[in-house]
């Protein structure tokens, strides 16, 4: 269970921040220097736009895992002229040395590994709280919590009863945080909502929330869906998870993956990368899917496609990757074999019904690793309390693949900040030529040399020599 981290530093002056240990800043700065060498997309944007400063005047509220790679993103936004306030989008994902380095550089950061839910929502509020009457005019989000906070808070200003019936611990903390803010500032959220020019959203779960708001007519500003840029979803979600999933599992448990039976629930891009990683280390991998197309893809790759109900007692390693909730429910959990490893690489902790386990005996083995005794007497190993295993138990995706994602984020922030008035309150994706530009920026680093079309070849397939090369409908 989460308890507050023991050591927190807070300084108020030219910059306010909350981090676990500011003395870790020098260590963080050394790792930032290494990461910069692995993030050619972001560094190219600094070179290209550093003099122009297209984000001058942007006040960005950032809610995204406070990692070393995110530190490079933050400093790129600042180099391009933005003011930034930052919180993590997950209670376990912060790398404390990264937070310290960015805070020491003068950026207000509110993040530490092992936040309580109350702290989490307090920190998310902190990125919305700017000096004077100012608030953020841009949101950079991962999972939709910052965006959702502004919108739910605005609803609560008009009708406080929307906060009357929290359904879980997360909502209890969220609703209490909103009520506390409204007790001192009754128009806080609506003021912020009016000045937001747009939001850029990093991940599948947050994008789903945005499309639902659009469908319901509740999206109050334009949004760019960064997740569905090809250079994000087909790289971060697939190749990033292929490396970081097993990193998290092995750091947490030290188990031999070879010879184990693993079940990946969900075979989207995240599930595909997760399945590859487990198979690559010698596990027998099964897939559970609701989508017939994804299920057929899995079967054609040689995976056995199964129902969780039919195989739950056989599985050594469970990985959820769906973006849905309670895909592993209480009935599944109590049937698991002794020492089964249970993990999630989707966004939220409700993919696994962790709440239903609270009445059982928990033994904390080390941070983010818990032994839970079931009624059968079997014990399961729950990783990161059902939150993101790759960030809770390891350090997330490698720098190079995050450079793809974060280059898209910077381009999306520039687009909405400079041209937000030309967008309706809908969800958009970046155009194909920018997607291809992001890819180009990363080729030299890995020694990839592009072939060039002749004019005759370009004319034959009816594309410009310099691209874009594919239609918007093309599926990579």
From Swiss-Prot:
Gene3D superfamilies: Adenosylhomocysteinase-like, NAD(P)-binding Rossmann-like Domain. PROSITE patterns: ADOHCYASE_1, ADOHCYASE_2. Pfam families: AdoHcyase, AdoHcyase_NAD. The gene is ahcY. Substrate binds at residues 67, 142, 202, 232, 236. One of its GO terms (cellular component) is cytosol. It comes from Prochlorococcus marinus (strain SARG / CCMP1375 / SS120). Binds 1 NAD(+) per subunit. PANTHER family: ADENOSYLHOMOCYSTEINASE. Keywords: Cytoplasm, Hydrolase, NAD, One-carbon metabolism. Its EC number is 3.13.2.1. This is Adenosylhomocysteinase. NAD(+) binds at residues 203-205, 237, 266-271, 289, 324, 345-347, 390. NCBIfam families: ahcY (TIGR00936), PRK05476.2-3 (NF004005). One of its GO terms (biological process) is S-adenosylmethionine cycle. May play a key role in the regulation of the intracellular concentration of adenosylhomocysteine. Pathway: Amino-acid biosynthesis; L-homocysteine biosynthesis; L-homocysteine from S-adenosyl-L-homocysteine: step 1/1. The keyword Hydrolase applies.
